[in-house]
Amino acid sequence: MLKAQISKVVAGQHLSEAEAAEAMDIIMAGEATPAQIAAFLTALRLKGEMVDEITGFARSMRRRAIPLTTSHPVFVDTCGTGGDGRQTFNISTTAAFVVAGAGVAVAKHGNRSVSSRCGSADMLEALGIKVDLPPDAVARCLDEVGMAFLFAPVFHGAMKYAAGPRREIGIRTAFNLLGPLTNPAGAPCQLVGVYDPDLTETVAAVLGRLGSRRAYVVHGSDGLDEVTITGPSKITCLDKGAIRTYTFTPEDVGLPRANLADLAGGTATDNAAIARAVLSGTRGPARDVVLINAAFALLAAGAADTLQQALALAESSIDSGAAAAKLQAMVAWVESWAA
């Protein structure tokens, strides 16, 4: 069923948005074989995914997702693409608790590890949070706690057809890009880390097409799909349809530079320990990189007018104990639901 699309992409031709949506519909309906899915994803990766193609894929997945509604008028997602291969701790997931502690609701979309040792779901489980709650419970958690984890397989059941081929080919594919673009709650504000600097404008353009209000799409010069503190980061801002790109350095907000080794992660247990330490107020590079990523997420949500103000909010979230309290509140809520 996917043969025509494979042939076109292998020939180096781009799919229209409608053609891309049709291809994803075929995959999500279970009408493509694992070999066809793997061939299609690999050919796309070699050609390079275009704005129309990614938009079509995202619209198809959004149509099939279980929607989540919330009472929060403003909320943010910190889901990135993953796939940067740098094996850091879970920076954006830790930052999500800092954002929530600062008073901005977070609908964190995520999954288990695909290419790293520990995905966001893996770390949250190590922190004591059951991740595969049904959608109605996730919605209540978001409304009552101000933070929830939207586990992709629960909301995007049809993704199961691509899971095997993705795992077996072991390379970054269009699906890495689709995580941040298919939040089931339709997060209007986002911080999106991408694994390739050439993707920041592309992903920002797709988010604009999909109706995002404000987003920061970021890539660290060290290869991180995060705002880094080891050197400059490429930042592409989408704000009410307008897109601009600039360079950020840690010195811009008075943060010291660090080495990539200072941000290293490990197993889910290791990463959970790092997250707990950061949220408890331990100072150092891990805290600094979490702070700056939380600051950009707070800026995306409109919680501050400047990055410096947003950074101060993030610092206060940790130092007041609010970020750690948000983690404990989420653990307690999920435990009470499961009891």
Swiss-Prot record:
Pathway it works in: Amino-acid biosynthesis; L-tryptophan biosynthesis; L-tryptophan from chorismate: step 2/5
Species whose genome carries this gene: Moorella thermoacetica (strain ATCC 39073 / JCM 9320)
Residues noted as binding anthranilate 1 in the record, renumbered to the chain: 80, 111
Protein name: Anthranilate phosphoribosyltransferase
Cofactor(s) this protein requires: Mg(2+)
Top EC class of this enzyme: transferase
GO molecular function list: anthranilate phosphoribosyltransferase activity; magnesium ion binding
Listed GO biological process terms: L-tryptophan biosynthetic process
Reactions the enzyme catalyzes: N-(5-phospho-beta-D-ribosyl)anthranilate + diphosphate = 5-phospho-alpha-D-ribose 1-diphosphate + anthranilate
Cellular compartments per GO CC: cytosol
